[in-house]
Structures are given as C-alpha cells and as structure tokens.
C-alpha cells in the first residue's frame, strides 16, 4: 500500500544574469548532467527532476510557488553553481512550504591544475555562492539539510537518499488520516496529546471511530474471502496443530481472519494509513486484533496500541521512509528487563501487535489467552527478531511543543529459548547502556510505546525533526546524564523563545 513511484524532488540551481549567455549555458548543461546522475543513483528512491537555472527574484519565486502546488514534488535540492545574490531568494524562500536540502557541491571534482583560468573560476563558484545562499537561509531561520561533497561521491548520494526518504515520510504525514478505533486507554497520560496542534504541525488528521464502524465490514466478509485468507495464513506461517483444519482452536483463527478482512476494508474505504485500537473499546468483536494488526503493519499501515495515535502516525511515516530498505519497522513497547552484573538488556514486546517485518524467520501462528480485555483468546504471530543495530523512536506532546526522542540500540540474540512466552519479541542493548539510556529516556518523558526500526537511523530522525520544527533528543553511545539534563534545560529556553518569535 506504499507507492512512491510518482514522487519527485526538484533540482533547482541558482545563478544570475550577470555571467552572460555562454556561462549560463554551461551552468544549465552541468546542472542537467548532475540531475541525471542523481536521478540514476540507487541511493535515491525518488525521481530527481531538473528545473531551469533561476537567475532573478521572479524566477525563484515562481519555482517555489510551483513546488508548493505540485503534488508529486516532495522537496527541493538547491545548489548555487555560480554566485547567486541571496536577496533574490528571500521572496521564494519565505513562501516555500516544501522541505529543502542544500547541496554544496561543484560540477568538477578536482581542480584542473594545468588549465585552470579565470573563465573556469567565474563558472565554478559554488564554494562562495553556496555560502551566500547559506547566509540567507540562516538569516531567515530556515531549517534545511546541508550535504557537502562531490555529487558523484557515494557518501553524498547516500545522504541525499536519506533526506529524500525523510521527505517521503513527511509528505505522507501531510496527507495521513489516522483512525482511532475506540478511545485512549483509560487514565493513560503519554498516549494523549493535542490532535489539533498535531494537524497544524505535521498535517495528519486524527479522528475517532466506534468498533461498530468496523463490525459493519466484518459482517460483510464472504466465505471465499475467508477461505482465501486462511490459505494465506497456512502458507505464510507455521500454524500450531490446533489451528489447522479440524483443530480445536481453528475457530479462533477463523474469527481473527474475519477481523482482519473487516478492518482492512474499513481502512481502505476511509483512506486511512494508520490506526489505533484499545482492548477497552472492542464492542462485539470476539477478540483483540492480533494477527490482523501484525499483517496490516507488515503491509505498511501505522499502528499504535491503546489509542496511541502519535506512535501510529510515526510507524506509518517510518515505514514509508524505509520502503525498499533491508530490515523492518514495528510498533514496540519496552516490556521487561534483564539485569545482570555484566550487562543489562530490555525485552521489547507487546500484548500481540509486533510487526513481522522484524522477524528473524517464518513466524509461528498461535492462539493463547490474553489476561485483559475480557474477550476470547486471540490469534497472533510469534517470533524472535534478529540481532543488529536499530533505533527506538518516541514522539510525545510536552504541552508547549512536540518532542522526538531517539535511543540507539543493538538487538541481540536471546540468551535462552522462550518456550512459554506467546508473543513476538526482541532483546536489545541500549546505548550507551541501560542505566544511562533509561535514565535519560525517563528524564525526557519518553513513552513506553515506541517505533522500533532496523532500517532507519538517527540521521533520518534528525532530518525529520528539522523539517517538522520539533525538538529532538538523542540517546546514543556518547550520552551522559549530566549533559542530557543540560540539553533538556537549554531546549526549554530555546523553544520558548523560538515559538514566540523573539
């Protein structure tokens, strides 16, 4: 359900009429070559579209207005081939609503020592042209990503690729509809938040629906739809004997399949990209959606448990960002600890809803009791997650602003089998260690729900926070509690002043 085939970033190159026809012809020629090279890069998942060299305030304003109104344009990569007086850019940058990446490069990689002359110097001026452009961006307090290096360098293309993936996620949030099926889990604080401010800040709309809105679709499920989905379950997962045809718990799997078909139809009809539910508002549903939610997440939907719409939206955004990359992304919860004198770890899991995109093999499909909710035993996929680097991401509402918290972690193989644990899980080592990471996370007000991603890194989240204009707190191998507390205190002052325009 994630289609990025029509998405594009525009390559906009700055110059001025001063240089004359021949120089400007070469500027355009070089710019088109660079745009084609970036467009062909395997690191950049979207189209890179060359736009004409802009040489005047009116041309700059026009291209920024066009970018704002073009639905397929998700951002602009800007480069100053020559010197482009930056006062010309004020009007355009002031109205530009799309994310901007400043590429500080030049057409040639090396200086042609034997032939360099003043014609070459006048043509290749990005070393100071981009500094002029950088000044006006900073003067306007315009958040942007800056990428420095030769455009053919893999490092540069990778950074541009990361930024383009982030703006894909940002573009998704601008149009995202989140369905809250039921309300927030009663008395829970961190999953609450200002949905109006969220729509102003991120673009996403969050609205509530009753479980009966989904029940209408469940009741329309046909025998053929049901049989087809059960066949998919049987081929995709290792079903326990009790769930196979004629098994004692087969009816539970059938009911889970009905819920998936109904829930999927509800989401498709409403154009929703993310959803929440809660075990306290299930209505006539016979079980909490387990395998249904897991499979919907695997198909790209965002999800948050217990009404957690912020995490649901972020799961969706990160799933869009990581399309085509190795590794998965899932709704997650810090569940329990493994404290030892040598090393301490977190076991992440949830009641049911961990995405199989992070599974280390073919999941097992099982039915077990669920101690809360008062419903029948739900079906779910059970698996471990592979070892490797990952991040946990939490978006929280601090009252005066949104705060994004990131903890870099390393997943490890569980120290033993978990034969009696009937849920999907992942064991990780927090950076720099559990003691510092958990202290910092708690001081930051980080949620117990997170987005866990094997494919997205902190750099993505840094770019995202800049685009969104929100606070970012990173917990990594360099974090100390003292410096982290200072950062929180400094941010309180910064964001107060920034938001009041002082």
From Swiss-Prot:
Annotated GO CC locations: cytosol
Disulfide-bond pairs as recorded: none
GO MF entries: L-arabinose isomerase activity; manganese ion binding
Co-factor binding comment: Binds 1 Mn(2+) ion per subunit.
Top enzyme class: isomerase
EC number from the UniProt entry: 5.3.1.4
Swiss-Prot/TrEMBL cofactor(s): Mn(2+)
Pathway assigned in UniProt: Carbohydrate degradation; L-arabinose degradation via L-ribulose; D-xylulose 5-phosphate from L-arabinose (bacterial route): step 1/3
Alphabetized InterPro entries for the sequence: Ara_Isoase_C, AraA_central, AraA_N, AraA_N_sf, Fuc/Ara_isomerase_C, Fucose_isomerase_N/cen_sf, Lara_isomerase
Entry coiled-coil feature ranges: none
Keywords: Arabinose catabolism, Carbohydrate metabolism, Isomerase, Manganese, Metal-binding
One Pfam family cited in the UniProt record for this chain: Arabinose_Iso_C
Catalytic reaction annotation: beta-L-arabinopyranose = L-ribulose
Entry superkingdom: Bacteria
One GO process term, biological-process aspect: L-arabinose catabolic process to xylulose 5-phosphate
Residue sites binding Mn(2+) per the record: 306, 333, 350, 449
Family: Belongs to the arabinose isomerase family.
Function: Catalyzes the conversion of L-arabinose to L-ribulose.
Protein's recorded name: L-arabinose isomerase
